[in-house]
């Protein structure tokens, strides 16, 4: 592996992939038990085994290192007004605590001196990215409409500057809503960079604030490997706010950020090349989903360069960029974007100087209650590199507020967290992949459907949908649900309730479908595509035969 391309484990809070290898199990058991030992499966409970965290001596229900006789400026002082920080501060205030949060001045591109209330998700992550996804999908819909009788006198044109201006206006509106939410909850918002001075003191641009508890919720930042010419590259922050649309763009990375931006720029009619170090995209996702999404993105004109690592970037006299890899050089790019992971934004916060334990990747070590090695200091969200998704940070924030100010020690619940990739076609899923399920439980039944959606029968486009259920052969509990195709995220969100509740395949079979929809396929798949057994070869095919008739 090219050492320059070593990617941090941390992902965005918007990330759909559970960090490291969060696995789903069905019975509480000691961490000392071998991970390879199959576990008995309850029909009603799915719990997750998150990456092991340090267990500290001081528990959540104690005074947590606070001096009961001391007077503090605030009960809770939060560094970072992103999704998790705002949620924790607001709930703390609702529970009767005095609360303050500090945040850097607003900017669409983050830096050591800029940030903004709302954090990555609102300003340079989930929200603006989804708006650009919407914008890019219209070109495909224009193509689809021809088969339904629509005709256009001229080719529709896209105005990039209008999109970015409208997007930025929406971000300002949302940031204002976040500020008002804090104000209405009685949370004091302080603009500036926070740094921890001691276990109960935060310095914000030279002014000191004392707090009974300090919460670190600073999120993460994009990571670009240190290669010659890296100054010519852009990251995901910049890609959301470019002054002009790329004509030809290289996207380095095979994760969800890379695929989402590949779909965005492809839909906006840029020439898109994706360079990945491995043979496949989306490491950690279900293998069939990985294959299906790459194949369908390629059909839309995206060119994948597999097993290629960047070596250098050069700039020609005409301003065009060239990307040199271990296999050769591709020239003529207007932009080169790196989507090679994110790192916890914990540098220069004063953590180590006050005794907070920080991992090699910069993530803050916490226990099950989000408490650090310093009893009065806590951390949530991407800064801890647990499960880096916005809804998870929100959950962690509420759990923390309950633990500290509601006399209700609460651990975040990482069971059956659904996730999505807003690629084109999009991906949605919840629970175990087939590979994880086979490793943990041995005997599983796999149900798949690969079909042409109804809309494609008239559009004439090569769009397809892939859907998959993974079921325990022993108990009939549905362990995982995965989909790639239109509305996958929306469909997966609904089924996530059932997966977390521990529903069985029989429960799915007993549910009446809504016709005609793609979602009904999840409750009409009756025959396993294959049966995977621990002590014998798999029975069946690696993929289902394509169904030529939509709605079947």
UniProtKB/Swiss-Prot annotation:
Leftover remarks: The active site is a redox-active disulfide bond.
Keyword Plastid applies: yes
Transit peptide: 1-60
Region (Disordered): 527-552
Cofactor note: Binds 1 FAD per subunit.
SUPFAM superfamilies: FAD/NAD(P)-binding domain (SSF51905), FAD/NAD-linked reductases, dimerisation (C-terminal) domain (SSF55424)
Binding site for NADP(+): 254, 257, 260, 277, 283, 341, 420
Subcellular compartments: Plastid, Chloroplast; Mitochondrion
UniProt-annotated binding residues for FAD: 83-84, 103, 120-121, 129, 194, 382, 390, 515
Function according to Swiss-Prot or TrEMBL: Catalyzes the reduction of glutathione disulfide (GSSG) to reduced glutathione (GSH). Maintains high levels of GSH in the chloroplast.
Protein name as it appears in the record: Glutathione reductase, chloroplastic/mitochondrial
GO biological process: cell redox homeostasis; cellular response to oxidative stress; glutathione metabolic process
UniProt-listed InterPro entries: FAD/NAD-bd_sf, FAD/NAD-binding_dom, FAD/NAD-linked_Rdtase_dimer_sf, GSHR, GSHR/TRXR-like, Pyr_nuc-diS_OxRdtase, Pyr_nucl-diS_OxRdtase_dimer, Pyr_OxRdtase_I_AS
């Amino acid at each position: 592996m090219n050492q320059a391309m070593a990617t941090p484990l941390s992902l965005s809070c918007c990330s759909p992939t559970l960090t490291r290898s969060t696995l789903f199990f069905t019975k509480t058991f000691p961490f000392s038990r071998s991970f390879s030992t199959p576990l008995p499966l309850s029909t009603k409970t799915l719990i997750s085994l998150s990456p092991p965290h340090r267990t500290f001596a001081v528990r959540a229900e104690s005074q947590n290192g606070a001096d009961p006789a001391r007077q503090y400026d605030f009960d809770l002082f939060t560094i970072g007004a992103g999704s998790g920080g705002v949620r924790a501060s607001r709930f703390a205030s609702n529970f009767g605590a005095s609360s303050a949060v500090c945040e850097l001045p607003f900017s669409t591109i983050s830096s050591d001196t800029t940030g903004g209330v709302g954090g990555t998700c609102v300003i340079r992550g989930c929200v603006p990215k989804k708006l650009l996804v919407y914008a890019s999908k219209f070109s495909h819909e224009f193509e689809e409409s021809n088969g339904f009788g629509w005709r256009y006198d001229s080719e529709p044109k896209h105005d990039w500057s209008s999109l970015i201006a409208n997007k930025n206006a929406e971000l300002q509106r949302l940031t204002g809503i976040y500020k008002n939410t804090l104000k209405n909850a009685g949370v004091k918002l302080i603009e500036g960079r926070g740094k921890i001075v001691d276990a109960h003191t935060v310095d914000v641009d030279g002014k000191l604030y004392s707090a009974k508890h300090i919460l670190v919720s600073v999120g993460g930042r994009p990571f670009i490997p240190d290669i010659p010419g890296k100054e010519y590259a852009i990251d995901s922050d910049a890609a959301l706010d470019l002054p002009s649309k790329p004509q030809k763009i290289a996207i380095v990375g095979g994760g969800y950020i890379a695929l989402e931006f590949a779909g965005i720029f492809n839909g906006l009619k840029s020439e898109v090349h994706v360079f990945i170090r491995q043979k496949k995209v989306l490491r950690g996702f279900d293998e069939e989903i990985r294959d299906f999404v790459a194949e369908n993105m390629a059909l839309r004109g995206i060119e994948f360069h597999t097993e290629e690592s960047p070596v250098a970037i050069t700039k020609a006299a005409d301003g065009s960029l060239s990307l040199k890899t271990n296999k050769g050089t591709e020239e003529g790019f207007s932009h080169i974007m790196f989507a090679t992971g994110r790192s916890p934004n914990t540098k220069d916060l004063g953590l180590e100087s006050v005794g907070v334990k920080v991992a090699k990747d910069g993530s803050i070590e916490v226990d099950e209650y989000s408490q650090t090695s310093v009893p009065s200091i806590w951390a949530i969200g991407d800064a801890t590199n647990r499960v880096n998704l916005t809804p998870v940070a929100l959950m962690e924030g509420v759990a923390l507020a309950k633990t500290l100010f509601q006399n209700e020690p609460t651990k975040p619940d990482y069971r059956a967290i659904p996730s999505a990739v807003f690629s084109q076609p999009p991906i949605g899923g919840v629970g175990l992949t087939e590979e994880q399920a086979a490793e943990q439980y041995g005997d599983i039944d796999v149900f798949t459907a690969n079909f042409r959606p109804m809309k494609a029968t008239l559009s004439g486009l090569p769009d397809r949908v892939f859907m998959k259920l993974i079921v325990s052969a022993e108990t009939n509990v549905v362990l995982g649900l995965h989909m790639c195709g239109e509305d996958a995220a929306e469909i997966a969100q609904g089924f996530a309730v059932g997966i977390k509740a521990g529903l069985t395949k029989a429960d799915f079979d007993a549910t009446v479908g809504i016709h005609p929809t793609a979602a009904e396929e999840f409750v009409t798949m009756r025959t396993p595509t294959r049966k995977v057994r621990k002590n014998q070869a798999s029975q069946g095919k690696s993929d289902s035969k394509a169904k030529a008739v939509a709605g079947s």
